């Protein structure tokens, strides 16, 4: 089968659109008064601060000193092949986490008093992520658990 120039152009534009699914980097993320931005109504977001079951995920918990736990989490996150660190503040990390086609935004907020790290992960594009953000946060939870306490 021989492709005509118009088909080649259409194919090239289609591939460009397919692989250019990063979307714009959100400018509304970050922590305000100990809170992360709420999830949108779409199911492609999870947050430990969400009140509805659709979006709710447990925060990361730790028993060791907050600074040690934070350093361990940072090591886990920075070591991920799919992660790019976007912002780092004391007790706050924001990363882009990539899949084959898409970019998701993940945030981590240290709550020293309660010995937890609040998490939020959301897809930039689309409506459903087929549970990808939740699975990824659970994977990070397992990696974050101290050695000997991993499930």
Regions found by a protein language model. Give the residues of each.
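Bacterial N-terminal signal peptides that target proteins for export
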Residues: 1-10
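Bacterial N-terminal signal peptides
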Residues: 9-18
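Ser/Thr-rich, low-complexity intrinsically disordered terminal regions
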Residues: 20-151
């Amino acid at each position: 089968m021989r492709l005509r120039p118009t088909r080649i152009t259409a194919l090239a534009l289609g591939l460009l659109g397919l692989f250019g699914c990063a979307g714009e980097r959100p400018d509304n993320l970050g922590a305000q008064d100990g809170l992360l931005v709420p999830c949108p109504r779409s199911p492609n977001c999870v947050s430990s601060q969400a009140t509805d079951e659709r979006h709710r995920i447990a925060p990361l918990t730790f028993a060791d000193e907050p600074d040690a736990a934070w350093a361990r989490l940072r090591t886990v996150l920075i070591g991920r092949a799919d992660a790019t660190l976007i912002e780092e503040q004391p007790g706050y990390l924001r990363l882009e986490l990539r899949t084959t086609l898409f970019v998701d935004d993940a945030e981590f907020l240290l709550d020293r008093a309660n010995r937890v790290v609040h998490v939020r992960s959301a897809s930039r594009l689309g409506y459903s992520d087929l549970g990808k953000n939740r699975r990824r946060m659970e994977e990070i939870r397992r990696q974050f658990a101290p050695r000997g306490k991993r499930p």
